[in-house]
Amino acid sequence: MQPALAPAPHPSMQTSAQDHADQVLHDSLLAAQHLSQHPQQPRPQQPNAQPHHLQPTATTSPRDQNNIDPAISGGAMLPPSQPPAQPEPTVEDETPKTYGKRPLSTSKRAAQNRAAQRAFRQRKESYIRKLEEQVKEYEVMSQEYKALQAENYQLREYVINLQSRLLDSQGEVPELPGNIDLNQPRTEISVPQPAPRPGQAGASAPPQGSPQSQVSIANDDMNSLNRIAEAGLGMRKHPNEEAFLSNNFQARRGRGDETADPSETKTEPPTHGLPMVS
């Protein structure tokens, strides 16, 4: 007994099925081309179930499906190949990187700020202590300078006293400073001459030159002493200088009187009448 043959499909039904398969193939090619051009963009996964247009319609009979060309129907009926799942990017810190370095978190930044402030305070305190020590050193130096200045004044007074005593004890005159000129004329002191005795006027006439010479010598001595006093650079006068000068003048005057007395006082010849033996 031979099996019954299936009736041949209608030509219009074959044409519609072929058009539908061509459309499905064209869509799959477009999708593959789109994936090749944009591989990085993730494509939403398609459900395993076939799309509505791939499922056989209720009106299509099993015989129509069997009559479709296997080369076309095989690729059309199979679901399109799924693209490989791309690995999900690892989740990094929420803060973006700037200039190749990751910015610090708020806590780390606050800790660094506190450390910087602490170091600044320490430097400021050390600098203040250093300045205080320098101020103390300057105060000590000022006190020492004042003490040295007072000692210098005392030593200057002492040197002036020594110079005045040297001038009194020795006749050496120190070197004349450049700002003092001793060539200026000075008024000479007039010394009163003693009045001659009435009984000895004739006898005292010849030796009158000796007291005048002594007076001129005294004047010269006083002038030289005045010059020495001018050369003392403002040195204080010795308290006994005037007394010394007056005593010296009186002594010289007394010596002049003594030299004049022997010539003035002559012994009268005796009245006994005998000749005198010289």
From Swiss-Prot:
Question: Compositional bias (Basic and acidic residues) spans?
Answer: 254-269
According to its UniProt entry, this protein's organism is: Emericella nidulans (strain FGSC A4 / ATCC 38163 / CBS 112.46 / NRRL 194 / M139) (Aspergillus nidulans)
Q: Pinpoint the bZIP domain residues.
A: 103-166
Give positions of region: Leucine-zipper: 131-162
Instruction: Fetch the InterPro entries from UniProt.
Output: AP-1-like, bZIP, bZIP_sf
Q: Which stretches are tagged as biased composition: Low complexity? A: 109-119, 198-214
Sequence similarity: Belongs to the bZIP family.
Is Nuclease one of the keywords UniProt gives this record?
Answer: no
Q: What is the protein's given name?
A: Putative transcription factor kapC
